[in-house]
Amino acid sequence: MKFKIEAQAENTAARAGIISTAHGEIPTPIFMPVGTVGSVKAVHQCELRDDVKAAIILGNTYHLYLRPGMEIIEKAGGLHKFIGWERPILTDSGGFQVFSLSSNRKLKEEGAWFRSHIDGSKHLFTPEKVVDIQRSIGSDIMMALDECPPGTSDYDYARKSLSLTHRWLERGWKHFNETSPKYGFSQAFFPIVQGCVYPDLRRESAKFVADLGAEGNAIGGLAVGEPAEKMYEMIEVVNDILPEGKPRYLMGVGTPANILEAVDRGVDMMDCVMPTRNGRNGMLFTSRGIMNMRNKKWADDFSPLDEEGTAWVDHEYSKAYVRHLFVANEILAMQIASIHNLAFYLWLVTEARQHIISGDFKQWKEEMVVRVTNRL
């Protein structure tokens, strides 16, 4: 994997670049649709490719390990072939999912014990096993196993958690360098900065991660209950330390405004389930603001779903029709909304990239943050 910075914005840390992988190039800043179990919910791969214009998607180690399992994925020749996706894939280590299980998991020095949410069976994720699973998946970018503590964690817990994450990271990094890809193309390994909302812990973790010299670095443990301003502060603290010449991936973030603020602070990659999850519940994000498609105000609005939208669905269907589909609980409503929201998110980061290159990102961003938070 290679990363080239093409432009640096003035009066801001925002930058535009290109990540080169075995499965293609990724223009940055980039938003990555989440395909947890090998599927972006309600969206075909051809729609992701041609309509949404996704350059990279996510898969999740925890979910893919449990179902369909590594034997099936290996027989298929890796996740790319299994799901019919020729562009890059990033896989999360599953650490966040294990953390989310709460009462059904135990963290030990050896790794994370957990019970499957599917059948209750007991499993152990070690830093080494998570690398092996992601070798079997064949993702272009794999993540280190970490603990993702709640944003409300006290300092003592946050420090203990960070120490465990760093010890796991050393083991995972060592194992990554001692193993080889299974499908004939290179894979990158991203370590994850943790430390909750404590600046000294974030600095310590960022330095630890930077010193590894991995091909890219991730920022985890944010957007987990802390105020947005605290999240932005932690991004600044971390990005002051992480090397400029490596891509920076902010995990699990967020709203359109969150994404713009993260890019402003030097983040290159982001992912979140929000555009698809909220879309399935009738919330549409647009360049003019947020629409709740269940609201009666759209019942007789026959204008296009989004006059400024880039997706086919934006101009093919009216607001009234999509509102009708949601009220009638039709599956098509979820599909249309998911495609629209993902296309909007990809449009947003593409526009951000263009404004970084043209030199007016800061002014554009300030105007856009106001617009995208407006309730229509």
Task: For every predicted segment, state its role.
Residues G151-Y155, R159, G216-L222, I331-M334:
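Glycine- and acidic
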Residues S163, H175, T179, Q187-L305:
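Glycine-rich phosphate/ribose-binding loops and adjacent secondary-structure elements
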Residues G24, I57, D92, Q134, ...:
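Conserved, mostly hydrophobic/aromatic
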Residues G138, L169, W173-F176, S180, ...:
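Structural signal for hydrophobic packing residues in well-ordered secondary-structure cores
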Residues K129, I133, I137, K160, ...:
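A non-catalytic, amphipathic alpha-helix used as a structural packing/dimerization or gating element
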